[in-house]
Amino acid sequence: LSVIHRGIATMTLDTGRCPKWLFSRMVTLGRDMTRILIEEYGPDEFVKRIADPVWFQSLGTVLAFDWNASGLTTILTAALKEAVRGEERALGIFIAGGKGKTSRKTPDQITEWGRRLDLGEAKTQALVYNSKMSAKVDSSLVQDGYQLYHHIFFFSENGAWAVVQQGMNTDAGTARRYHWFSENAKDLVCEPHTGIAAQARHDTVLNLVARESDPTRDLSIEMANSSYGSLMRDIEILRRHSSSLSKVLALKHRGSGEQLTLLKLEDVEFRSHPVVHEDFSKSQYLEKILARVTSIRPRTYEELVAMEGVGPKTVRALAL
């Protein structure tokens, strides 16, 4: 079960609720459209099209949710989930997850469908893993200031699957939707995107899935496989030489004479990355997670990211 990133869409962040009369009509029309699309093209093609941000947006508009705002994502996926309820086996598609607290039930709902469909432990856990990793990559490796609050997982019995998840940036008043689709063998942590469609562009973004970040990912793994004592000695150097001012520190290795240059930045106007406000050189959390990481010694960057407890702060700390 391989994966590629299919695309990203950015839209305004709206408030309020969808009228009940509109939602019920979206469910009714969505049920008929889903039946026709699957009858004509099959469940795998339907899942594939869900992963296309433009097609997905168009489907929401056709179902009469014609606001170009964040609510289209949550309302459309909820309507589709309700539309196929009770007909999943006949249609050949299955939907797990949703908005807010429901998004955290995605693994359990996938597992339940795996049991009912007799998919087997390996296939079911692979689906659960891809669901979790898509969320981790978009929240930890693409730190663009959007906090995920919606995650929904579509899949077919043949193994095709798609993820539609959305994050919000309250400062910018925008939402960003991320689409994933299982197709072709791709690296989960290196340039998984195949297309980005956005109205808003942010310059202060930590993009650790970029190919240019290869050296950073490699060095992060090198550090994760070094000794905890070695890492802590480097942190002690930071503690002795850090200050609250932004400046460059030039340190010489006593043995080799090799110079190490460190950049210390003050915390100003960087709200899209609140993690940068934490002084990692004095973080007990960082010490705890680094101790765990160095004891486990992940072999690849994907294994590092997949570790429990490793999130945006740990990833950014290693990158810094």
Task: Say what each PLM segment does.
Residues 2, 31, 284, 288-291:
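C-terminal extensions
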